[in-house]
Amino acid sequence: MSQKTLFTKSALAVAVALISTQAWSAGFQLNEFSSSGLGRAYSGEGAIADDAGNVSRNPALITMFDRPTFSAGAVYIDPDVNISGTSPSGRSLKADNIAPTAWVPNMHFVAPINDQFGWGASITSNYGLATEFNDTYAGGSVGGTTDLETMNLNLSGAYRLNNAWSFGLGFNAVYARAKIERFAGDLGQLVAGQIMQSPAGQTQQGQALAATANGIDSNTKIAHLNGNQWGFGWNAGILYELDKNNRYALTYRSEVKIDFKGNYSSDLNRAFNNYGLPIPTATGGATQSGYLTLNLPEMWEVSGYNRVDPQWAIHYSLAYTSWSQFQQLKATSTSGDTLFQKHEGFKDAYRIALGTTYYYDDNWTFRTGIAFDDSPVPAQNRSISIPDQDRFWLSAGTTYAFNKDASVDVGVSYMHGQSVKINEGPYQFESEGKAWLFGTNFNYAF
């Protein structure tokens, strides 16, 4: 695995933390910004205004609130992602539960200024990913540890033009932190085999090099990359109210440009750099810098909410993410030399969701939803550190209102991912995944 390949995987992982659902929505986006939304598979989020969390999706919904409103909570993600396969060396590539559990917190506040204007703020984690393999895992050169976290700070405002039309605009500041580690696994054995099968294997020097490669311990850290950075963008929304029971929304989230500076190191001896081997560039434990610019894709969403009966409502969404903007990754050194330039060729992807809400009485509200997440990652670009796949959602939830001011939301979703094949480096894998998500939020109107 060359430094080009290593940097590509690391950069893509950083991109994942910022633009998209492996923390459980296809394309690596995190949808988990509220527990009420979780209970309806995030259907109709741009048009529903049942708590302050919806405003982080569509700022135009601020005009639906007549009192300052607060919401805070978290979603617990319990994934079950398993990898299987056999290395060319004969070692097993089986790894269970490679994605650890995680908490995704959220906090929202909305405040009307008058009948026409209002503002809101939120703290969410819109993107994230974590996969962990044992340090001695045979495929450690493409597995290892991938740990990515983000925090999104949003400030937005809204204007009501008349009884039908409202408009909202928001500013987003995204903080991202990434840590990537890769280990030798059985890569040394595979490299030694390649050398011995080549003309170099007939020479004393080549045989000595093969012996050295074959002696690399599985837990040797062949690459380490970490970094953090801020990125900025904006979002906007339009809300059309046909009447008090029927409303529709169009929302937009802009591209975000992220300029990363990361620290790269490898424990391999620098002597390996002289032979053009398929391993990361060796630094002998020293650290060097790498720079990466990512233009993260925009997202559009159309939503609707229809209260078809005093006790029943249906809601739906269609989201479209312009992943085709993500065509390549390019990293450079401090001197400006290209460290890698790799064609990614992502395709645009969509998410469709449908749900229903039952207003039982003044205290109890029940909701359900289903959704389908289309993966933007072409089969040839899948990775075990980012084992993306199409996903299906089944969701249910409830809200209990203590009084007219305070309420609590509870939501649960089950996600099922398709079984997929992954070809990465010299390895062939099969991956299957599913997840349970549990969320709760407390809401208060002042």
From Swiss-Prot:
<comment type="similarity">
    <text>Belongs to the OmpP1/FadL family.</text>
</comment>
<keyword id="KW-0812">Transmembrane</keyword>
<dbReference type="GO" id="GO:0009279">
    <property type="term" value="C:cell outer membrane"/>
</dbReference>
<dbReference type="GO" id="GO:0022834">
    <property type="term" value="F:ligand-gated channel activity"/>
</dbReference>
<keyword id="KW-0732">Signal</keyword>
<keyword id="KW-1134">Transmembrane beta strand</keyword>
<dbReference type="GO" id="GO:0015909">
    <property type="term" value="P:long-chain fatty acid transport"/>
</dbReference>
<feature type="signal peptide">
    <location>
        <begin position="1"/>
        <end position="25"/>
    </location>
</feature>
<keyword id="KW-0445">Lipid transport</keyword>
<comment type="function">
    <text>Involved in translocation of long-chain fatty acids across the outer membrane. It is a receptor for the bacteriophage T2. FadL may form a specific channel.</text>
</comment>
<protein>
    <recommendedName>
        <fullName>Long-chain fatty acid transport protein</fullName>
    </recommendedName>
</protein>
<dbReference type="InterPro" id="IPR005017">
    <property type="entry name" value="OMPP1/FadL/TodX"/>
</dbReference>
<keyword id="KW-0813">Transport</keyword>
<keyword id="KW-0472">Membrane</keyword>
<comment type="subunit">
    <text>Has been isolated from outer membrane preparation as a homodimer.</text>
</comment>
<dbReference type="GO" id="GO:0015483">
    <property type="term" value="F:long-chain fatty acid transporting porin activity"/>
</dbReference>
<dbReference type="Pfam" id="PF03349">
    <property type="entry name" value="Toluene_X"/>
</dbReference>
<keyword id="KW-0998">Cell outer membrane</keyword>
